[in-house]
Design a protein with these regions (language model features):
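Amphipathic alpha-helical interface segments used for oligomerization, scaffolding
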Residues: 1-149
Protein backbone atom coordinates (compact mmCIF):
# COMPACT_ATOMS: atom_id res chain seq x y z
CA UNK A 1 0.00 0.00 0.00
CA UNK A 2 2.81 2.39 0.90
CA UNK A 3 4.53 1.90 -2.45
CA UNK A 4 1.25 2.29 -4.34
CA UNK A 5 0.38 5.49 -2.46
CA UNK A 6 3.86 6.89 -3.09
CA UNK A 7 3.36 6.34 -6.83
CA UNK A 8 -0.11 7.91 -6.67
CA UNK A 9 1.21 10.90 -4.74
CA UNK A 10 3.74 11.55 -7.47
CA UNK A 11 1.29 10.99 -10.33
CA UNK A 12 -1.47 13.01 -8.64
CA UNK A 13 0.81 15.85 -7.50
CA UNK A 14 -0.30 15.35 -3.88
CA UNK A 15 1.51 14.61 -0.67
CA UNK A 16 1.78 10.92 0.20
CA UNK A 17 -0.15 11.60 3.40
CA UNK A 18 -3.11 13.18 1.59
CA UNK A 19 -3.11 10.53 -1.15
CA UNK A 20 -2.87 7.72 1.39
CA UNK A 21 -5.64 9.12 3.56
CA UNK A 22 -7.99 9.67 0.61
CA UNK A 23 -7.35 6.25 -0.91
CA UNK A 24 -7.73 4.49 2.45
CA UNK A 25 -11.09 6.19 2.99
CA UNK A 26 -12.24 5.28 -0.51
CA UNK A 27 -11.07 1.70 0.01
CA UNK A 28 -13.17 1.60 3.17
CA UNK A 29 -16.29 3.13 1.58
CA UNK A 30 -16.16 0.87 -1.46
CA UNK A 31 -14.75 -2.14 0.40
CA UNK A 32 -11.80 -2.33 -1.97
CA UNK A 33 -9.03 -4.62 -0.74
CA UNK A 34 -5.92 -2.50 -0.17
CA UNK A 35 -4.07 -4.76 -2.62
CA UNK A 36 -6.49 -3.62 -5.36
CA UNK A 37 -6.54 0.11 -4.63
CA UNK A 38 -4.05 0.66 -7.44
CA UNK A 39 -6.83 -0.03 -9.97
CA UNK A 40 -8.75 3.00 -8.72
CA UNK A 41 -5.54 5.02 -8.78
CA UNK A 42 -4.86 3.94 -12.35
CA UNK A 43 -8.39 4.94 -13.38
CA UNK A 44 -8.06 8.37 -11.76
CA UNK A 45 -4.70 8.87 -13.46
CA UNK A 46 -6.20 7.88 -16.83
CA UNK A 47 -9.16 10.25 -16.36
CA UNK A 48 -6.77 13.05 -15.46
CA UNK A 49 -4.60 12.37 -18.49
CA UNK A 50 -7.60 12.51 -20.83
CA UNK A 51 -9.40 15.54 -19.40
CA UNK A 52 -8.70 19.02 -18.10
CA UNK A 53 -9.24 17.84 -14.50
CA UNK A 54 -6.22 17.36 -12.25
CA UNK A 55 -5.97 13.99 -10.53
CA UNK A 56 -5.74 15.67 -7.13
CA UNK A 57 -9.05 17.47 -7.80
CA UNK A 58 -10.72 14.23 -8.91
CA UNK A 59 -9.52 12.53 -5.71
CA UNK A 60 -10.72 15.44 -3.60
CA UNK A 61 -14.16 15.46 -5.21
CA UNK A 62 -14.42 11.67 -5.14
CA UNK A 63 -13.57 11.66 -1.43
CA UNK A 64 -16.51 13.99 -0.84
CA UNK A 65 -19.03 11.92 -2.80
CA UNK A 66 -17.92 8.36 -2.13
CA UNK A 67 -20.56 7.44 0.43
CA UNK A 68 -23.48 9.07 -1.37
CA UNK A 69 -22.36 7.66 -4.74
CA UNK A 70 -22.06 4.15 -3.31
CA UNK A 71 -25.49 4.47 -1.69
CA UNK A 72 -26.87 5.56 -5.05
CA UNK A 73 -25.42 2.43 -6.63
CA UNK A 74 -22.34 3.70 -8.43
CA UNK A 75 -19.08 1.78 -8.35
CA UNK A 76 -15.88 3.56 -7.41
CA UNK A 77 -14.88 3.79 -11.07
CA UNK A 78 -18.26 5.23 -12.06
CA UNK A 79 -18.08 7.74 -9.20
CA UNK A 80 -14.55 8.71 -10.25
CA UNK A 81 -15.79 9.33 -13.79
CA UNK A 82 -18.66 11.45 -12.49
CA UNK A 83 -16.30 13.47 -10.28
CA UNK A 84 -14.01 13.94 -13.28
CA UNK A 85 -16.91 15.18 -15.42
CA UNK A 86 -17.92 17.82 -12.88
CA UNK A 87 -14.36 18.94 -12.14
CA UNK A 88 -13.64 19.09 -15.88
CA UNK A 89 -16.37 21.73 -16.15
CA UNK A 90 -14.03 24.01 -14.23
CA UNK A 91 -15.64 23.61 -10.83
CA UNK A 92 -13.47 23.37 -7.72
CA UNK A 93 -13.60 19.88 -6.16
CA UNK A 94 -15.62 21.18 -3.21
CA UNK A 95 -18.29 22.63 -5.51
CA UNK A 96 -18.26 19.55 -7.74
CA UNK A 97 -18.65 17.28 -4.72
CA UNK A 98 -21.52 19.33 -3.30
CA UNK A 99 -23.29 19.36 -6.67
CA UNK A 100 -22.88 15.61 -7.17
CA UNK A 101 -24.07 14.83 -3.65
CA UNK A 102 -27.11 17.07 -4.06
CA UNK A 103 -28.03 15.58 -7.41
CA UNK A 104 -27.61 11.98 -6.28
CA UNK A 105 -29.54 12.57 -3.07
CA UNK A 106 -32.43 14.18 -4.98
CA UNK A 107 -32.48 11.32 -7.46
CA UNK A 108 -32.23 8.72 -4.68
CA UNK A 109 -35.44 10.10 -3.22
CA UNK A 110 -37.10 10.87 -6.54
CA UNK A 111 -40.38 9.27 -5.44
CA UNK A 112 -40.53 11.56 -2.40
CA UNK A 113 -40.00 14.82 -4.28
CA UNK A 114 -42.69 17.45 -4.63
CA UNK A 115 -45.04 18.23 -7.50
CA UNK A 116 -42.67 20.72 -9.19
CA UNK A 117 -39.88 18.15 -9.32
CA UNK A 118 -42.24 15.49 -10.68
CA UNK A 119 -43.62 17.95 -13.24
CA UNK A 120 -40.07 18.69 -14.41
CA UNK A 121 -39.46 14.95 -14.78
CA UNK A 122 -42.68 14.63 -16.74
CA UNK A 123 -41.57 17.44 -19.06
CA UNK A 124 -38.40 15.41 -19.63
CA UNK A 125 -40.48 12.36 -20.53
CA UNK A 126 -39.75 10.59 -17.24
CA UNK A 127 -41.72 9.59 -14.19
CA UNK A 128 -40.55 9.40 -10.59
CA UNK A 129 -41.59 5.77 -10.37
CA UNK A 130 -39.83 4.85 -13.60
CA UNK A 131 -36.65 6.66 -12.62
CA UNK A 132 -36.67 5.05 -9.17
CA UNK A 133 -36.92 1.59 -10.76
CA UNK A 134 -34.21 2.43 -13.29
CA UNK A 135 -31.86 3.58 -10.51
CA UNK A 136 -32.48 0.36 -8.57
CA UNK A 137 -31.75 -1.73 -11.67
CA UNK A 138 -28.84 0.20 -13.21
CA UNK A 139 -27.77 3.30 -11.30
CA UNK A 140 -25.21 4.44 -13.85
CA UNK A 141 -27.52 3.85 -16.80
CA UNK A 142 -30.35 5.71 -15.07
CA UNK A 143 -28.07 8.62 -14.24
CA UNK A 144 -26.77 8.80 -17.81
CA UNK A 145 -30.32 8.69 -19.14
CA UNK A 146 -31.35 11.48 -16.78
CA UNK A 147 -28.37 13.67 -17.68
CA UNK A 148 -28.75 13.11 -21.42
CA UNK A 149 -32.43 14.04 -21.41
Amino acid sequence: FTETVAKMATAFDMSAEVAGDAMAKLANVYQIPIANIDKLGDAINQLSNESPAKASDIVSSLSRVGGVAKGFGLTELQAASLANAFVSLGKPPEVAGTAINGMLMKLSTVDKQGPKFKAALSAMGMSAEGLKKAIATDAQGALLGFLQT
